[in-house]
Amino acid sequence: MRHFFKTTLYAIGFMSITLSNPSFAAKTETYNQLNLFADVFERIRANYVKDVDDEELIEAAINGMLTSLDPHSTYLNTKRYENMRVQTSGEFGGLGIEVTMDKGVILVVAPMDDTPAFHAGVKAGDYITKIDGEQINGLTLNEAVDKMRGKVDTDIDITIVREGESDVIELTITRAIIEVQSVRHRIEDEIGYVRISSFTEKTTSGLRDALKEIDEELGDNLQGIVLDLRNNPGGLLDQAVDVSSTFLDRGEIVSTRTRNDKNIQRYNAKPGDNIDKKSLVVLINGGSASASEIVAGALQDHERAVVVGTQSFGKGSVQTVMPLSTNGAMSLTTAYYFTPSGNSIQNEGIVPDVVVEQLRLNDSEAIRARRSEASLRGSLANPNATDEGDDEGDDEGEEDD
């Protein structure tokens, strides 16, 4: 009886400590949930009808945890992490499309210029539903991208659903080494035209080389520059900052803000406008995302450029790639982008100063033009909104293939 009494007092005392210490209670609940995970893991290993690989189970659990947050947080195993590092260097193998997951299938954000997918006729807003005859449903984004990659000069069959088209589109595309020449230029009369298709490590140097060649050819006859960011899915933040700085003398280009505005980082222009304040027009459309929107937003807010086209994609979140102990990494959404005027790009995009609809051959083009970050299930709400509502995350981030 005395032992029971002591035990009861101990239990009551433990409960009192727990109730009076919310953080302790929260930690206890977290540990209980981790124990639940371990319990499920062991039951699968012991009782599942087929043999399972421990590493694959854990990787699937990590993927599920990250992809439940928003469409852009994802796990990168060793192979995918290495692929990502190769992609940002500006040369990799694949088809040449920027993709994300939407409603269980692959959504094409934009095809990259002069790549196999581009020449095959893949368009922004297309849904890829099958790869080599296999349904995409049930695959993660990473698994689907892995299937699209392969040896150079081998063929892949993809099935595309294009809204506005009654029939599915079957394409056979030959894989190639994708050497992304992210900057191209030409001269039309006395106007310099510069096309940036993505933001890789070589983009800023490519832009400045292009401007130098234009200046050498036109000299004082140069009337202005057209900077084409249409169907540019984005890329490296530092390159977006440097490209913006190329046309600005001073001022903020973009700021990033973490949870509860605990950490605000501002990126400012360096002195020197490479085209001496000559006229600048920036072209955008619904395929202009992320880094493209940073450039367009900065030049628009500083009234340095006239932005022309249609509303951009609206991806205003920052993904930080965090290396893990397994030689893999996770890409985690850690902050929002804000333009110099304090506006968030998230789900809103950049609204052009002059709206010019692209030439469309049919209604499907109009439907594709409306594809945006906000249309993705699980997209994060705009932090400038007074009522953010609930986010329901069940899709994954973007990848190049």
Which residues fall in each region the model found?
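C-terminal "post-core" interaction segments
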Residues: Y31, R184-D401
